[in-house]
């Protein structure tokens, strides 16, 4: 954390590649959504990766965000009156957000690790988590999402089909198109191409 030195060599290359994945246009969209979803009292961060990290680092804004997606009376994360100043309390607040986001439906592969945000290791992963959360909120369409629905992609939803017993029986008598046909093209009347191979001793 505070006493971690700069990375060199291969570690530096890896960190550089991770930092290049950060999308500044996406940052603007996420900031707009968080402000609309949570209210203007959350403030606005300085532009750029570092400003975005500092804004979200203590976990309070993230907790307010996930709470705003739930109805009153069933908020999953307790938000402290005063933002926590102790490091472990801040990390605990971020961990509570991650747990609530997972309970909301964000899959584990879309989740960032606490250190990704806290140490600024992988802010692109933080963006991915927030995008997944926004997409889920738009898809659920339960009245708690605020903002432009075009900011996030709507996830595909399951469409189960129910068949009656008679429909299932009728389906057994249908010949599928992949089973072929006894009409149409055939080799009747065709002659072989070219002459057969001549083997002379």
From Swiss-Prot:
GO CC terms of this entry: cytoplasm
Source species of the chain: Homo sapiens
PANTHER family: CALPONIN, TRANSGELIN
UniProt name for this protein: Transgelin
Induction: Overexpressed in senescent human fibroblasts.
Residues where Omega-N-methylarginine is found: 183
One function term, GO molecular function aspect: actin binding
Cross-referenced SMART domains: CH (SM00033)
Lineage, opening ranks: Eukaryota, Metazoa, Chordata, Craniata, Vertebrata
Calponin-like repeat ranges, renumbered to this chain: 175-200
Residues with N6-acetyllysine modification: 172
One GO BP annotation of this record: epithelial cell differentiation
CDD domains: CH_TAGLN (cd21279)
Subcellular location: Cytoplasm
SUPFAM superfamilies: Calponin-homology domain, CH-domain
Family that this chain belongs to: Belongs to the calponin family.
Subcellular location, principal: cytoplasm
Methyltransferase found in the keyword field: no
A Pfam family reported for this protein in Swiss-Prot or TrEMBL: CH
Calponin-homology (CH) domain span: 24-137
Origin: domain of life: Eukaryota
Alphabetically ordered keywords of this record: Acetylation, Actin-binding, Cytoplasm, Methylation, Muscle protein, Phosphoprotein
């Amino acid at each position: 954390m505070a006493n971690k030195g700069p990375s060199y060599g291969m570690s530096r290359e890896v960190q550089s590649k991770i930092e290049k994945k950060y999308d500044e246009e996406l940052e603007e969209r996420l900031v707009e959504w968080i402000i609309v979803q949570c209210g203007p009292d959350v403030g606005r961060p300085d532009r750029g990766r570092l400003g975005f990290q500092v804004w979200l680092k203590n976990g309070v804004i993230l907790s307010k965000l996930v709470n705003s997606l739930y109805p009153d009376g069933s908020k999953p994360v307790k938000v402290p009156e005063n933002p926590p100043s102790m490091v472990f309390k801040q990390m605990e607040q971020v961990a509570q957000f991650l747990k609530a986001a997972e309970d909301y439906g964000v899959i584990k592969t879309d989740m960032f690790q606490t250190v990704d945000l806290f140490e600024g290791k992988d802010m692109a992963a933080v963006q991915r988590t927030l995008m997944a959360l926004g997409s889920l909120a738009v898809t659920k369409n339960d009245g708690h999402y605020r903002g432009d629905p075009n900011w996030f992609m709507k996830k595909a939803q399951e469409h189960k089909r129910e068949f009656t017993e008679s429909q299932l029986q009728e389906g057994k008598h249908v010949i599928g198109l992949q089973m072929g046909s006894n009409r149409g093209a055939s080799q009747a009347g065709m002659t072989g191409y070219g002459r057969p191979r001549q083997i002379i001793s």
